[in-house]
Regions:
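Bacterial N-terminal signal peptides
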Residues: 9-21
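Surface-exposed amphipathic alpha-helical segments
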Residues: 376-412
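Acidic/histidine-rich, surface-exposed loop or edge segments in extracytoplasmic proteins
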Residues: 29-51, 363-387
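Short, solvent-exposed recognition patches
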Residues: 48-361, 370
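Boundary at the C-terminal end of the N-terminal hydrophobic targeting segment
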Residues: 24-28
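Bacterial N-terminal signal peptides that target proteins for export
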Residues: 1-10
Length: 412
């Protein structure tokens, strides 16, 4: 699963453009006590690729938008933002895309999962400025957006990122978002607030075998790349050493040197370049340097993984896994969980979703980001500590006063 930022990206571009235009027009004045408005719901963003990836009919997309509109109605009742002052509110929704992941055993087809997407809340500051002798008032500009992600529980939502040893392999595993207390009565996991029947059940442990399989695929990819490199260098060395090819290069050099002031010097220069190239290619293939050494090391690293997997018993392979970057060796970094100082590894728990419900039904909401606006104790966090009533302050007010019971009732 992935969060589709197409709509957000366009909005952000428009926001930045507006700010530049306003600043260039003259000095702005924030109107922190000016009443604002909740603007009408913006057109729902459900691009063709997302609809296709989600196997979503127009009727299903419309029903999903209806659910987001119901959530929007609940948010509008939040007492601290119901009658905005110093800012105006814009909200919009989107349908997120979905694609099969290359290394994700058992990942369901899109039609077996509920639709996913999100609602974006933005509190935009009210300000005015002078242009051509006229006072212009606007409620646009740049702000910190608050996302309400619906039915999105996969990698890249609120987790801590990829494991370095997994490289660029396309997979759906990640470091489990860990519980970090509560915010406004909602459990915080990683950088998100989770509203669900059982937040901890959104993810399922990744087995040690599965974690090592991804490492093995990443290392196999490195071996394949180095083998191709060595193959290309070997082929080039054969050409450089080929007597016929060398004779042709020297003959061409002699022909080119015929009109030069010192033809013999030019030919010697070409002979030297051939010698230098041959030496460089030989060094590149050496077992002590270059691609030759890299391939030997990569094969050893791959064998380290495959040999470890082969030595594991079935029970050890099936054990939940965890990861610690401070482990030093591969066996120190990947361990069976639980282990002190070791971060659990997980996958999305696709079976969390109730398949008997309509695919448009909301079953989980994750509010993110959290640290950007709630980490007020960090004096370097300018957004969280901004005096503006818009942006982070409005986001906090929304979350602190919204009817969470109504949101829970809205979830299926």
């Amino acid at each position: 699963m992935r969060w589709d930022f197409v709509r957000l990206g366009i909005g952000a571009l428009a926001i930045v453009t507006t700010v530049v235009e306003v600043v260039s027009a003259g000095q702005t004045r924030s109107l922190v006590d000016e009443p604002g408005t909740w603007k009408p719901w913006k057109p729902f963003a459900a691009i063709a690729s997302a609809r296709q990836e989600r196997a979503a009919t127009p009727a299903l997309v419309k029903a999903f938008e209806g659910e987001l509109l119901a959530l929007n109605t609940i948010l509008r009742r939040a007492t601290a933002v119901a009658s905005p002052k110093g800012f105006s509110v814009e909200t919009w929704g989107n349908l997120a895309g979905y694609r099969p992941t290359e290394h994700a055993p058992g990942q369901p087809a899109a039609a077996e999962l509920p639709l996913a997407g999100g609602l974006t809340f933005g509190a935009f500051p009210i300000f005015e400025y002078q242009r051509n002798g006229k006072t212009i008032r606007e409620d646009t500009g740049e702000t910190e957006l608050q996302l309400f992600l619906v039915n999105q529980i996969g990698r890249g939502v609120i987790d801590s990122g990829n494991v370095p040893e997994w490289g660029s392999i396309d997979h759906d595993a990640f470091l489990q978002p860990l519980p970090i207390g509560e915010v406004a009565g909602l459990p915080r996991y990683g950088d998100g607030l989770v509203i669900a029947r059982d937040p901890a059940a959104l993810w399922t442990p990744l087995s040690l075998r599965a974690a090592l399989d991804i490492v093995g695929k990443a290392r196999q990819l490195e071996v394949d790349g180095l083998e191709q490199n060595v193959k290309a260098v070997t082929a080039r060395l054969a050409v450089v050493r080929d007597p016929a090819a060398r004779a042709k290069r020297l003959k061409d050099a002699e022909a080119a040197a015929a009109t030069m002031p010192n033809p013999q010097a030019f030919v010697k220069q070409i002979e030297e370049s051939i010698r230098v190239e041959e030496a460089a290619l030989v060094k590149e293939l050496s077992p002590t340097a270059g691609a030759g050494k890299g391939l030997i090391d990569a094969r050893k690293a791959l064998a380290e993984v495959t040999d470890w997997i082969a030595a594991l018993s079935p029970a050890e392979q099936a054990a939940p896994s965890c990861y610690t970057a401070k482990g030093g060796t591969l066996r120190g970094k990947f361990r069976a969980a639980p282990s002190a100082g070791c971060h659990p590894l997980v996958r999305p728990n696709y079976s969390y979703f109730n398949k008997t419900l309509p695919r448009s039904s909301p079953q989980v909401v994750i509010i993110t980001p959290v640290a950007r606006c709630f980490d007020t104790s960090n004096k370097y966090n300018r957004e969280a500590n901004s005096p503006s009533p818009a942006g982070c302050r409005a986001n906090r007010a929304l979350i602190e006063t919204m009817d969470t019971n109504a949101i829970r009732a809205w979830l299926r």
